[in-house]
């Protein structure tokens, strides 16, 4: 829906979606709002939050706090990904692959916001299946969390980085 960008300290915050939801009770409907946000330092740390409240600002604030609490570290390679990765969450599937310098972020909607705040500058990506923003964000973060640097893989296998890279 709307993309509000704010910087607090070294963290970048992006609002991905605000949604009005209702609960039907005997006396009518109770309206509330949900907010989906992502937070990142632009250098490999990223997290998302989902907040719900009776007012929009309160929902956004809750979502931002949850995003700051749920941050993960992503091993980036000079502003792009280490290797092609796939992520899945419920009906959403995302595929991302590294891109050469100058390509930019080729991604749509919710995925673009996650990649921007994570500090990815060049990437090719595609979302398949459900494009529900919550599921796409979760799938994107799943893919980024599953990405491993050559140094990590080499250490786990007990080999040198040159042996891993061929």
UniProtKB/Swiss-Prot annotation:
GO terms for biological process: translation. The keyword rRNA-binding applies. The keyword rRNA-binding applies. Keywords: Ribonucleoprotein, Ribosomal protein, RNA-binding, rRNA-binding. Signal peptide: none annotated. SUPFAM superfamilies: dsRNA-binding domain-like (SSF54768), Ribosomal protein S5 domain 2-like (SSF54211). Coiled coil: none annotated. Transmembrane segments: none annotated. PROSITE patterns: RIBOSOMAL_S5, S5_DSRBD. One of its GO terms (molecular function) is rRNA binding. It comes from the Bacteria. Residues 11-74 form the S5 DRBM domain. Pfam families: Ribosomal_S5 (PF00333), Ribosomal_S5_C (PF03719). One of its GO terms (cellular component) is small ribosomal subunit. The N-terminal domain interacts with the head of the 30S subunit; the C-terminal domain interacts with the body and contacts protein S4. The interaction surface between S4 and S5 is involved in control of translational fidelity. With S4 and S12 plays an important role in translational accuracy. Located at the back of the 30S subunit body where it stabilizes the conformation of the head with respect to the body. Belongs to the universal ribosomal protein uS5 family. This is Small ribosomal subunit protein uS5. It comes from Actinobacillus succinogenes (strain ATCC 55618 / DSM 22257 / CCUG 43843 / 130Z). The gene is rpsE.
């Amino acid at each position: 829906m709307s993309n509000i960008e704010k910087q607090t300290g070294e963290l970048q915050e992006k609002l991905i979606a605000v949604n009005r939801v209702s609960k039907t009770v005997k006396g009518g409907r109770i309206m509330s709002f949900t907010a989906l946000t992502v937070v990142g330092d632009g250098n490999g740390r990223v997290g998302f939050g989902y907040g719900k409240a009776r007012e929009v600002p309160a929902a956004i604030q809750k979502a931002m706090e949850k995003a700051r609490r749920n941050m993960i570290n992503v091993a980036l390679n000079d502003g792009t990904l280490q290797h092609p990765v796939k992520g899945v969450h419920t009906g959403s599937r995302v595929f991302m692959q590294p891109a050469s310098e100058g390509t930019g972020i080729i991604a749509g909607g919710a995925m673009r916001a996650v990649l921007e705040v994570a500090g990815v500058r060049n990437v090719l990506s595609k979302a398949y299946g459900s494009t529900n923003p919550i599921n796409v964000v979760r799938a994107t973060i799943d893919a980024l969390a599953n990405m491993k640097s050559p140094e990590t893989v080499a250490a786990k296998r007990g080999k040198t980085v040159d042996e891993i890279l061929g």
